């Protein structure tokens, strides 16, 4: 039986290597603030943003100062609440920082009701990547059957979501991946990230992309923008490379009158407000369930094996077929 008086959590005490900055702690649970809901976490995943926040890269160095508990999304059950919308035993998605712990006290604004039947590994992935992909395709770009989208990081979790949404929403997609032979799709519109993209598009007789979504930045982002023609649209939504764009990126963007912008889910949330965010999540969840959008899990590991999990994610030789999901201990 779970101890509801003690909380087990993964704490971050400083920026740097996870082995030196993370520690499993057991702390007493205090009284619940009257404006919060207490959730027992059932599963929480590891995203690139989690690792960036642990290392203290970019914006995370300023917005997520240690000491803190990492983790930005999870699934769990309400165990204590004075909020009318969230009753005890209600299953919820937790969309806030600090999810790598057994219990988390959350503002109702950061909780989303979800069906009881959704598997933990699926449910805990329904926010960061899923909502980002949904908002980018349906709101920011409003893709339709006339559009040709090109994405990089095609083998990533969000890359696989874009691929599935191209089928359910009806737009065309060209996928750039460093693992073209392992890509789980029947489409022929797969490009090798290690070869010239424009040459591959021509050789395969593919249409010219109208919209590009860049998750990497740096040199890969520069290569991606060169696939767009005059007045194309280029959106950066991630910097997995941790590198800046090369000068030729901006030279090409200017010469082709390309519409360049950035997208970060947190800024979109702040601009649109909590009601819009909740409406978009509800619409997205209905679409994902109705259309069988998959969110893959490679394996489940307990909190006390978080170092093993991070080693697997950062390994140059291990190929993961989905997220590593952390489970409370």
Residue ranges and their predicted role:
Residues 127-194:
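Mid-domain Rossmann-like dinucleotide-binding core that forms the NAD(H)/NADP(H) cofactor-binding site
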Residues 176-180, 215, 238, 264:
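N-terminal Rossmann-fold cofactor-binding loop
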Residues 196-207:
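Short amphipathic alpha-helix with an adjacent loop that forms part of the alpha/beta core around
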């Amino acid at each position: 039986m779970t101890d509801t008086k003690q909380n087990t959590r993964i704490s971050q005490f400083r920026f740097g290597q996870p082995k030196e900055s993370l520690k499993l702690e057991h702390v007493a649970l205090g009284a619940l603030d009257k404006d919060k809901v207490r959730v027992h976490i059932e599963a929480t995943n590891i995203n690139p943003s989690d690792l960036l926040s642990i290392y203290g890269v970019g914006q995370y160095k300023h917005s997520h100062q240690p000491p803190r508990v990492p983790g930005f999304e999870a699934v769990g059950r309400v165990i204590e609440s004075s909020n009318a919308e969230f009753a005890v035993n209600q299953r919820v998605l937790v969309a806030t920082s600090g999810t790598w712990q057994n219990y988390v006290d959350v503002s109702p604004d950061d909780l989303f009701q979800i069906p009881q039947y959704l598997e933990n590994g699926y449910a805990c992935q329904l926010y960061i990547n899923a909502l980002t992909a949904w908002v980018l395709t349906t709101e920011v770009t409003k893709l339709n059957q006339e559009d040709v989208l090109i994405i990089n990081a095609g083998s990533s979790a969000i890359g696989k979501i874009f691929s599935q949404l191209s089928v359910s929403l009806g737009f065309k997609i060209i996928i750039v991946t460093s693992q073209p032979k392992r890509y789980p799709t029947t489409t022929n519109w797969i490009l090798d990230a290690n070869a010239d993209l424009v040459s591959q598009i021509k050789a395969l007789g593919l249409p010219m992309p109208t919209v590009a979504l860049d998750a990497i930045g740096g040199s890969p982002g520069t290569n991606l923008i060169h696939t767009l023609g005059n007045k194309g649209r280029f959106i950066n939504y991630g910097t997995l490379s941790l590198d800046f764009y090369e000068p030729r990126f901006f030279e090409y963007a200017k010469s082709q009158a390309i519409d360049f912008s950035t997208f970060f889910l947190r800024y979109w949330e702040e601009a649109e407000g909590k009601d819009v965010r909740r409406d978009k999540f509800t619409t997205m969840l209905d679409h994902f369930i109705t259309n069988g959008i998959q969110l893959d899990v490679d394996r489940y590991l307990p909190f006390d094996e978080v170092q093993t999990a991070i080693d697997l994610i950062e390994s140059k030789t291990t190929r993961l077929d989905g997220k590593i999901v952390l489970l409370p201990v």
